[in-house]
Amino acid sequence: MLVTVGSMNERVPDSSGLPLRAMVMVLLFLGVVFLLLVWQALGSSPNSEDDSSAISTMTTTTAAPTSTSVKPAAPRAEVRVYNISGTEGAAARTADRLKAAGFTVTDVGNLSLPDVAATTVYYTEVEGERATADAVGRTLGAAVELRLPELSDQPPGVIVVVTG
């Protein structure tokens, strides 16, 4: 005689946590989110955006010859830095600052110029000197003026006199 106590197909619920299917679905979802974030990060690298915008800009510029032309940047003048104070190394420190800011410093030395009380940037009317002098003045926080007659024997370029 055969006695059946219960059906073999009955499931006993496991109340210890999430069902296995739910846990697999959550893990798959998190994996997809992670892959999307990686894909977005790789797709939006600064180099790829810069390259594509540069290409489209270049294409637009050549395709539209009637567009407004951009004035070419004025040439940067050479910069000479002279110490007119008794502070040793003042011109060299200033020249290093200007080089770090991207200026072309061609001469560093000492100079005698008695009537200047503060660090000043001097320029002539040669093309590019005024713009360079203004940029140097902003970098150093110094006044910008036309070149003094006492500096007429100096070679062309922007002259920075450092008072210390």
Swiss-Prot record:
Disruption phenotype: Loss of the gene results in lower growth rates at low densities in rich media. In contrast, Beaulieu et al. show that the mutant grows normally in vitro but is markedly attenuated in the lungs of infected animals. It is attenuated and hyperinflammatory in primary human macrophages. Disruption of the gene causes altered immune responses in macrophages. Infection with the mutant leads to markedly increased release of TNF-alpha, IL-12 p40 and IL-6 from primary mouse macrophages.
Keyword line: Cell inner membrane, Cell membrane, Cytoplasm, Membrane, Virulence
Phenotype when changing T60A: Does not affect glycosylation; when expressed in M.smegmatis
Topology with respect to the bilayer: Peripheral membrane protein
Entry annotated with the keyword Cell membrane: yes
Secretion signal span: none
Record protein name field: Vesiculogenesis and immune response regulator
Organism: Mycobacterium tuberculosis (strain ATCC 25618 / H37Rv)
